């Protein structure tokens, strides 16, 4: 049962606590968040890099509008699918929200499965300056005029170590690296080597992480069921509406989200009329006038669903790895585990089930 067997008589959760409920996709963390919200003590902060996008509802398993009204979430529906939102943006927004929630006499409850965000909160980010909007506009103009391959070649000259790690298709990171260099005169790899600064190092706050790592076979069944429900609820049509309502590029972070990426690939493979509204690396995609029969569409559709399922399981696999790393880096000391005393300002406990995490947290309220 993870750490839960070793926890005895834990102290009450202090007023300066920041609680982080961390678990893989489809593991049931949202339901627990709702129960905690109903105690009247918590405000929910979403830790999900897909829920930030407006109009991306079905494929992200976003809470319904009625749920969001009953259980308000911070950092949900905050940008359009055409926009970008960095880890640094998330940390900055979270810092402000944590302070505001504490001022209201409540406890921040961070809930979600974007483990990169949690790693930034617990382990810190390199002190990379924010990009000047004018520099960003200049680099974007370069990308549109020269193409991403030319920018990658440029990056290999100014920051060879980073260029080796980034594939040509990683538009977001390539442009970000060039923005940093053009603004500071130093390569991004230089900034990444500097000491990191973590929001959770604030001595005035107590950060409590609950890392839930359920049985994988059980989780795989939950993932398969969730995807079946998404397709039935109109996920494919949702992507069509996004392409109709927004000027989207297949390389935008929103369209690289699991599920959305596989639908885009299907549209391209079947020469779907919607691809005329899509761009790839800034270049328009034209219909080829292919005659795609129903049998081919059916095969391509099943392939899309299989790939979405596989990609979601791979996402969960990565989430387990990140969770284990967080626990290894911030697990409680032996003294804390046996006494239950709160002697550390930042700690991550591991649990095998959401129910175990629930029992532990409610014992501290």
UniProtKB/Swiss-Prot annotation:
Its cofactor is Mg(2+). Its EC number is 2.5.1.75. Gene3D superfamilies: 1.10.20.140, P-loop containing nucleotide triphosphate hydrolases (3.40.50.300). Substrate binds at residues 25-30. Signal peptide: none annotated. Keywords: ATP-binding, Magnesium, Nucleotide-binding, Transferase, tRNA processing. InterPro entries: Dimethylallyltransferase, IPT, P-loop_NTPase. One of its GO terms (molecular function) is tRNA dimethylallyltransferase activity. ATP binds at residues 23-30. It comes from the Bacteria. The keyword ATP-binding applies. Residues 48-51, 172-176, 256-261 are annotated as: Interaction with substrate tRNA. The record marks 114, 136 as: Interaction with substrate tRNA. GO terms for biological process: tRNA modification. It catalyses: adenosine(37) in tRNA + dimethylallyl diphosphate = N(6)-dimethylallyladenosine(37) in tRNA + diphosphate. Belongs to the IPP transferase family. HAMAP family: IPP_trans. Monomer. Catalyzes the transfer of a dimethylallyl group onto the adenine at position 37 in tRNAs that read codons beginning with uridine, leading to the formation of N6-(dimethylallyl)adenosine (i(6)A). This is tRNA dimethylallyltransferase. It comes from Psychrobacter sp. (strain PRwf-1). The gene is miaA.
